[in-house]
Amino acid sequence: MNQSTTIERGKAAGASPFHAGELAVQRRAGVAEHADAAGRIGIRGFMPEQHRAFFAQLPWFIVGGVDADGQPWATLRAGEPGFVASPDPVTLRVAGGALRDDPLADAWRPGAPFGGLGIELPTRRRNRVNGTVAGLDGAVLSVAVTQSFGNCPKYIQRRTPEPVAPAWPAVPLRRASALDEADRMLIARADTFFVASANLDPDAHRARGVDVSHRGGLPGFVRVDDARTLTVPDYNGNRYFNTLGNFVSNPRAGLLFVDFERGDLLYVAASAEIVWDGPDLAAFEGAQRLVRFRLSEVRRSEAALPFRWSAAEYAPQFARAGAAG
């Protein structure tokens, strides 16, 4: 029996990998038994070799964290493949890659929670890794892994990146308390966004920390209700409910919208409310529930992403679901 098998069996027989908020959502959705069985096997305390190799081949990496005020943010880092690496199964190293205007630029210190998502748009592969910052060495961030698990390829739009030189001179960061017309248009045509959430309750044990996840749909799946309110459908996923479970414990959320054509990054701080039923559900085909985000801050960093992407090839699930999350 190898070390990985020993770890897996010990974990499966031990405590649940989920915290109270995740368990509450699983029970309400009627999937608690399924999630418990799947989570005990699928959520590891180490990265398998396949994930370690996958992260090392990526030119970008989605990151979630919290700032000094406890606000979660979803952001990203970019670099030559290999800038994210893993010297051993329980350590992830991110060597630089921070972009200008990164809302988490000053957030990293030993013990800080870290959520990571490796996503490869051309192949629709994605894997998650969570942990805490173990150390800083200049621009290198070292993360001690507490949770590692894969996600299925559903709802990911296929795109191919092309590197570009950074825009110069850089346009100053725009900060506001509400969306302007350009922001609303970006969100209205978005087919992808990323969301960071957090549960920092010590009682959450190894489920404590930050999650950052992907959401995808056809353009218009994020409804702009007004300049400070967004409504998003929640569709069938892995049934772990990491993000929604965090919202039960802590409604603060950080959203990241990427303009794949221009390279703009739109960072949104918000408070999340889960809408379990009601007439609004009918407006979103196939939605099992909704999430309503009430915005408190908006930051737009123009042409910050050092890639431009090909037109989207939409995920095959949309032929059945219309939109998805």
Where are these regions (language model features)?
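Binding-site signature for planar aromatic cofactors or substrates
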Residues: 1-325
